[in-house]
Amino acid sequence: TPDTEVDTGNGIMNMYGSKMRDHNWHRGGYGKIDVTRILEVSSNVGVSYLIDKHYKDNPQKFVDGLKRMSIDQPLHLQIPGEGKPNIKGPKERYFAKTTLPWMSIGYETQVPPINILTFYNAIANNGVMVRPKFVKAAVKDGEVVKEYPTEVINPKICSDHTLTQIREILRKVVSQGLAKPAGSKQFSVSGKTGTAQISQGAAGYKSGRVNYLVSFCGYFPSEAPKYSCIVSIQKPGLPASGGLMAGSVFGKIAERVYAKDLRFDIRSAIDSTTNVIPPVKAGEMNEA
């Protein structure tokens, strides 16, 4: 549950001989925090501890849960070049005891950004996962010759109760967590940050040169979502922050899109003297 507490200690936890670290381990970690705060601050220790605690005796149950949400499904996009997601199971080679905790924070899996965006769009869309589309209709000589309807991949990725909880947490990630740069004063934003080392092929994560993938995926406005977006940035070396770097880009995109979309109903913008109030930003009619 969102209020379940985990002692993340000093930000370093031993996981089967390997060290799981939080981004602030050198500053002493976060100590005891609840699940909501774990996600707000992207605590690797908190997430991996919980997943390992509940699924270490049956990791297949964790993998099955991911697959029930269709996050591993090919999207069959309308354009070529689609990446294929890969989430391995405990029956496959190289599934060690460390695999589950590291999978829980995004390592040892391959999920293209468009698949992550599709998943977050489903959260915003009341749990209904739809296939991304780039073409709504084919037109020839002004006539529609073919339409491409919305296709549902998964009618319900989770229960309504779970959906309500995760949407509230994702809103707090932006309003009071590490993703504040993705927020806006004009409307509410929900989403999650991501910061990961990029594997260097055969050298894995231990080569001398370290590249990072920082990301933020979310939707807005939080209360009545209309847009979803993902920003992924590959950069060499530190510093690397999904919230600060990708989140800032997301915030600028969101404000630009929202500003273009704002349209006041002129009929409701007429005062007692029948003077028309000019269109302004949401919540700023008094400045007209």
What is the role of each PLM region?
Residues 158, 209, 238-249:
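Short alpha-helix boundary/capping segments
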Residues 1-233:
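Beta-lactam-recognizing serine transpeptidase/beta-lactamase-like catalytic domain environment
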Residues 144-151, 247-288:
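Short, gly/Ser/Thr-rich active-site loops of penicillin-recognizing serine hydrolases
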Residues 237-239, 259-260:
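Short beta-strands and strand-coil junctions in structured, solvent-facing domains, enriched
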Residues 60, 164, 244-252:
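Short, well-ordered alpha-helical segments
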Residues 38, 109, 207, 236, ...:
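Intrinsic structural disorder
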